[in-house]
Structures are given as structure tokens and as C-alpha cells.
Amino acid sequence: MSTEGFDYEAAIVVVGGGACGLMAAYQAGRRGLDVVLLEKDSRLGCNAEIASGSIPAAPTAHQRRAGVTDSAEQMMGDILRKSGNQADPDIVRALCERSPELIRIFEDELGVAMELNTDAGRYGFSALRLHNGPGRTGAPLIQALRSALAGMGNVTCADRTPGAGLITDGSGAVMGVRAGMRGEQRLGAQRVILACDGFGSNAEMIARYIPEMRGVQSIGVQGNTGDAIRWGMELGAAVAHMSGYQGHGLVCAGYGTRLVPEIPQLGAIIVNRQGERFAREDQGYSEFAREVLAQDGQTAVAIFDQRMVDVVARLDHWKDTVASGAVKSAQSLQELAAAFKLPPEALERSFAQCCGDLPDPFGRARLPAPAEAPFHGAVITGAMVHTQGGLVVDVHARVLRPDGSAIPNLYAGGGSAAGLSGDRPEGYLSGNGLLSAYGLGLIAGEHAAASLLARSH
């Protein structure tokens, strides 16, 4: 395709205005380069904005103050172990080693008050290392990056201007991006960073790569159509882990909200409509989605008590869930069982497995079972949050071909790049998505900028 006749030219064009794209644009912009950020539609939000905003990082000052001993190596081990050793160890190491820097950037450069989540651990974690902004949602992090970019005169943020394809020269090197609803604009670029999300809203790609989730609700934002992955594949890029995804087994059926992951970790009991437990409740919420979807009606009932609610009551996601009406309350377990039409005898047996004399067939850790009135419950189902497969990149976030060579001038991160979770939902460890998004955004923006600045000297 001809490289002449560009409507606009920039040093770097970033496609996608979520966590990865914003961080990439920030890293390149603060180095003084001319950056254009294309965003499909910020009104749709991004997955990082509606998520809990949990960034795993180690070691950090927050951990030290809390008496938590941790390291990048320990964090790397947890991620690789959870992925079944399918994640690329070089990528995992690069992200883990840069993780404390992410927390520092948000605190020291962007003014976000970060905290270490000490309310409850996460399945697969050997130490407390999830760091959050205010209210424990992702919105303050995204807003801080947007505000920072708005103050940079060398960064142009083009909202409601989706990327529509890549422009290459005769050798296959990327030279720019087509943009606009019909691809009517041609933007020249010395470097292009693909920072779109995955393909959770693309029914055709779901049917092809993740058939078990065909027709299952996706709670990610609806603009995730896999565009960047397809563009890369058209240029001969390698892809990996296309069957991988992050599930969520704690979605409040019919309410558009979800229980926070702390609830099962604090000891909630989850039963099917027959009042029977069907899996260990404290497993990862990603793989738990499959367990819930296998039950009658693809639903289950989570039961928890006031002690657990008191721990999470201040969280914005929890407030939204309560406001939605998804949580029912009662002064006794018998009343709560009646409210959800659960057989009381079966429910008693389920409780006995967790805190009584019966052995637990699922091997759950002995957690305090719901015991303090008032008792609470919610009907939950399984859903998909976002896909984990994508373009293969190196430790500098450059997009690679199957032979390991880099496609010239092309970078990828976030949902556009292969994630850290391997081929299955059980490979997902809490925070993998944001670590990959913000981390690869940092790395891509930094490397793309450095490569151009080095060439100019």
C-alpha cells in the first residue's frame, strides 16, 4: 500500500484508549514525542475502568509497611504456576520486575492514592500484593491518565475515532494506521502501538476460539471486537493462547452487578438450587465461572454473613451490587433458605461440610462459615470478562512473527497481546489483565519512544 498522501503524521500512533493505550501514550508523550491516541468511543468505557483496578506489584513500600515479604521472583512464580507454566516466562519476568514502577507512577506522577488490599488474599497468591486506587475500582486510574494526557500539548486524543487497519510499505513494515468509521483517514506513524482490548464481543471469534463460551454473557465493555488481533494476523503475526479467557463466577444473575472476590475468600458458602455445594468456593473466580454455568439453570446461590459484609462495605463495586437489589437478607439461615427456595436439609449438610463434622469433599481451606446474623445471599451466574489470547510480543512489546522476527514498527499490549494466563480460564490469576495492560503499555511506549529518540541523535 502506498505510504504517500497521509492526512496527518505523528511519531507514534496508539490505537485504543484503555489502560494499555493510555499508559503507552503517557510514556511516549512525557518524552516529548508527537503522539496520536485513537479511541473507538470513550463513552463505552474500558475494561480497566469498570474493573476493580487491582494491580499486582512486588516489592512495594505499601507491602513493606504492612509487613508483607514479597519479591518479583515470588510474584513471577505465582503467575507461572497458575498458568500451568504456559505463560511466556520472559514476558512475565519483565512485567513483574516493572510492577513496582506502575504503583510509583500512579502515586508520584499521577497523584492517585494507592493502597495495598489486605482485606483478603486471592487464590494462587503467596503474598498480599494487589494495589488499588480509591474505592477499589479502576476508574480513578484511568481518569488520572486521561487528565495527564489532556495536559500534554504534544499528545492528541481522538475520541470516537476507531482504528480501521494498518498501513504497510512494500516490505511489510508498518507505516501508519487507517482511522475513522470507514477508514477514511490515513495517519502516518513511525511507530504504531496496538492497545485495543480482546475479542469478547466478537461472536464469530468466540465461536471459533472459545466455543465453550458461545452464547454466554460477556460483562466486559462491548467494543472489544478483536480488531487489532486480526490486523496483526493479516500481517503474518503469531498469536497464542486464543482459547484463554478470564471468567467471573460471581456475577449477580439479572442485575448487571457482581459480588466482590473477597466474599468467597472470607468464607461464603455457595450452593446450587438443590442446596448442595458443587465446588470449592475459594478457588479462582475465573475458573469458578465454568463451575456455576454447569449447574441447573446456570445459577447458584452465595450465602454470607454480616461479618463478611462489614469487610467489603466500603468498596464501590459492593455498593453498586447492594444498590442494584441483588442481595437479599434475613435474620436466620432458615429464612434465607426459604427466600431462595433452597431445601433446608441439603443446606444444613452443606454447612456441615464447611464448619461441622462432615469432611469437605472439595478440599476448601477451613474458613469461617457464615455464622453471624443478619445473613445475606445472592443468585449468581458465570460470565466472561475478557479474552486472554492475542498477538505474540517480545519483552519490548514488539509484535513477532512465528519465526520470532519482529514486524517492523509494530507494538502491542493489553488485550491485543497474548496474556499471562495460558489457554484456559483457570490459568487466570487476579490482576493478570491489568498487569499486562499497564505493564506492556509502559514498556511499549517507553521502547517505541526510545528507539525514535536514539535514531534522532
Task: Please tell me what each predicted stretch does.
Residues 44, 95-184, 189, 202-205, ...:
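Conserved redox-cofactor binding core of oxidoreductases
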Residues 229-231, 237-346:
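An anion/pyrophosphate-binding glycine-rich loop and adjacent beta-alpha core
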Residues 165, 346-424:
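A glycine-rich dinucleotide-binding beta-alpha-beta segment and adjacent secondary-structure elements
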Residues 183, 187-251, 434-443:
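Glycine-rich loop(s) and the adjacent beta-strand/alpha-helix scaffold that form part
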Residues 30-51:
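Glycine-rich FAD pyrophosphate-binding loop
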Residues 12-37:
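N-terminal Rossmann-like FAD-binding beta1-loop-alpha1 element of flavoenzymes
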Residues 56-95:
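Glycine-rich active-site loop/strand segments that organize a redox cofactor
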Residues 1-12, 30, 450-453:
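Extreme N-terminal leader/targeting segments of oxidoreductases
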